[in-house]
Amino acid sequence: MEYEVVIGLEVHAELATKSKIFCSCTTEFGGEPNTHCCPICTGMPGVLPVLNKKAVEYAIMAGLATNCQIARYSKQDRKNYFYPDLPKAYQISQYDLPLCYNGYIDIEVNGQKKRIGIKRIHIEEDAGKLLHDQWEEGSLVDFNRCGVPLIEIVTEPDLRSSEETRIFLEKLKAILQYTGVSDCKMQEGSLRVDVNLSVRPKGSKEFGTRTEMKNLNSFRSVVRAIEYEAKRQIEVLESGGVVVQETRRWDEAKGITLSMRTKEEAHDYRYFPEPDLPPIIVDDNWIEEIRKRIPELPDQKKERYIKEYGLPEYDAGVLTSSNAIANYFEECIKYTQNIKAASNWMMGEIMRILNDRGLEPEEIVNIKIRPNQLASLINLVDNKTISNTIAKQVFEEMFETGKDPEVIVKEKGLVQITDRNVILEAVKQAIANNPKSVEDYKNGKDKAFGFLVGQVMKITKGKANPQLVNEILREELEKI
């Protein structure tokens, strides 16, 4: 029997506010444990929360950017459960009246557009963090994260594969970063993904029993976990078993999901309206004011790159997939007329060094090559000061040292040879040293010409102007 995978996501994104959702404590990441908290964060008796207006605005902005309806009236609710990192024994969240609902994000899979529904976006506070490796006798609790504002983005069960899920998450991450709603640093926990997954016979309309997967701290983990869990559930069904509705933990090292606990239902949390906070009232003027602050989003920027810069759709898609990459590219083309070359360098060498060093796209801001330096390198090639081959060598040194390309070219004597007489001598030497290749060329073997060009470049240490090498070499070969 052929099965279909059905996937829905719950994505938690930390909002980019400077202070927490119900108090003035900082949201800065990385402080000493329990130094960024106060009686409100830790739920001491007698304290009252005050809602951070900026958190609401960021949530509305996320809703507008994902085509959601914005609720004019919503409220906050207490979600009751016990866990050591939850000092109040309840989390302030939203239950039946979320701030944003009925949205969507369009993605492209194998050249086909697909719409993924956003069921709701609601605001809530984060819990603390358990530290398991700092005390031999047990676990410790760090309350710094308590009260950090989150949005939870809940999708409809519209995703059908790990690939669709990855593409959707990359698009969502880009939208949140473009709008400034969240920095989405997964390594710092500011973007966390829970995956709800079930399988059903292909063609069936009924949903299977779902499991929820947690501890997914990278998109690669999400993809691997989906592929493993789908296979596991299919094997259970085909062996006559029953899939248990439960929460499962992804074990990155072993590449498997492990049972954590049975899956809770809403009634298990005994939700009730938060008595210490008034309802959230949002009027049209406030929504329009926030809408005006939304910058150009990835899809809009992609269309502009295609129309304004004449870039291929694929290139435009890659360059706009991350706000940091797009900003780097736009800064680069302020200093060079050759937009296509800038795109090629970004798509080729820049992406390569990010991938080779395991850097996220947003970490492009930390590399030593500045956008204006990349533009200078492009200009050196365009004005024939250096060849493309030499430019790649210069690029590597720029990445390691941060030096300007002009400085590297001067220090290493890499200026392109354009003197015809010098190139002619190198051509004659290459011809004299490789009679077999000359004979092959005369017999119609085109590859022999490429080999001879390579020999000339080797003699000139890659510094000869390639166009002149081709021209002079052909002239000399015709004389033979």
Curated annotation (Swiss-Prot):
Q: Which InterPro entries does the record cross-reference, listed alphabetically? A: Asn/Gln-tRNA_amidoTrfase_suB/E (IPR017959), Asn/Gln-tRNA_Trfase_suB/E_cat (IPR006075), Asn/Gln_amidotransferase (IPR018027), Asn/Gln_tRNA_amidoTrase-B-like (IPR003789), GatB (IPR004413), GatB_C_1 (IPR042114), GatB_Yqey_C_2 (IPR023168), Gln-tRNA_amidoTrfase_suB_CS (IPR017958)
Q: Which residues form a coiled coil?
A: none
Q: Does the keyword Protein biosynthesis apply?
A: yes
PROSITE patterns, per the entry: GATB
**What are its GO biological-process terms?**
glutaminyl-tRNAGln biosynthesis via transamidation; translation
Single GO MF descriptor:
ATP binding
Superkingdom is Bacteria
Keyword Endoplasmic reticulum on this protein? no
Reaction catalysis annotation: L-glutamyl-tRNA(Gln) + L-glutamine + ATP + H2O = L-glutaminyl-tRNA(Gln) + L-glutamate + ADP + phosphate + H(+); L-aspartyl-tRNA(Asn) + L-glutamine + ATP + H2O = L-asparaginyl-tRNA(Asn) + L-glutamate + ADP + phosphate + 2 H(+)
* Top EC class for this record: ligase
Q: What is its EC number?
A: 6.3.5.-
Query: What Pfam family is a match, any one?
Result: GatB_Yqey
Which of UniProt's keywords are assigned here? ATP-binding, Ligase, Nucleotide-binding, Protein biosynthesis
Cited function: Allows the formation of correctly charged Asn-tRNA(Asn) or Gln-tRNA(Gln) through the transamidation of misacylated Asp-tRNA(Asn) or Glu-tRNA(Gln) in organisms which lack either or both of asparaginyl-tRNA or glutaminyl-tRNA synthetases. The reaction takes place in the presence of glutamine and ATP through an activated phospho-Asp-tRNA(Asn) or phospho-Glu-tRNA(Gln).
- Subunit and interaction comment: Heterotrimer of A, B and C subunits.
Which family does the entry's similarity section mention?
A: Belongs to the GatB/GatE family. GatB subfamily.
Its name, as the record gives it, is Aspartyl/glutamyl-tRNA(Asn/Gln) amidotransferase subunit B
Species this chain originates from: Caldicellulosiruptor saccharolyticus (strain ATCC 43494 / DSM 8903 / Tp8T 6331)
